[in-house]
Amino acid sequence: MPRERAVVSVFDAGFLLGDGVWEGLRVWGGHPAFLERHLDRLFEGAKAIMLDVGRSRRELTEAIYSTLRANDMTDGVHVRLMVTRGVKRTPYQDPRVTIGPATVVIVAEHKEPLPATVTDGITLFTTHVRRAAPDTLDPKLNAHSKLNDIIACIQAYTAGADEALMLDPHGFVAACNSTHFFVVVGADDESEVLTSDGRYCLAGITRANVLEICQANGIPARETTFSLTDVYAAREAFVTGTFAGIVPVRSVDGRTIGDGRRGPMVERLQALYRELVDADVAARIAP
């Protein structure tokens, strides 16, 4: 369907209230990478908010592949899979006023990160907006409502940075507004990769893959709490996400990280991650 005809009702719960869950997928060789993990997260999130997706995992998989085939898309594609609670009879929060099935939208676009971003990296700015606590809006939910992250993003680009670095309610580093954050610390022969303890961030697919890559290749890595002091003193830093994979960080709050260029650990992890993606899509068979 042409994008100008792709519309939803103004009474849709996603439009009215941000009531829904979603996933972003990268496609290579005609296959969505790590599809099972993304569907796991989607269905777990939907169950947590009592949202009936209305389609099976297989039906969603077939719909994704059908969309890719209809648009002749094989490489360099980003897919956004969105599920909302559906159309309501009136603008109101209560899910019981929903009058139809869940709304499912698949947006597939040819979209790739700029090569310079992947090699030269990005800049971060620490915002005053904190990651929410699990008893307010659990950060583990990949919900449509992203206003907390959007406000942080606005603060970051207003300050001249590419993305926001966000702290948890206790002042430790949590994540960025749309990616996960890692630092490389220690001497050359004792380098260690650190990321947050995971309590205040989305259960990132790429984040998990990076930790598994480290374990498989003898690279010390762990989830822990650390502060901005550790960030400013880090040898390297990088962010992870489905769209761009692994991206180096040049500076945080105007403080140069390392020598301000992509470091050897980031370059190594980028290569290992690319191998993992290639292996995953090569093993897939389209339905």
Language-model segments: which ranges?
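Conserved alpha/beta cores of soluble small-molecule-handling proteins
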Residues: 1-165, 169, 202, 211-287
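Glycine- and Gly-Pro-enriched alpha-helical subdomains that act as flexible
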Residues: 164-165, 172-198, 203
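N-terminal G-site helix/loop of the GST-like fold
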Residues: 208
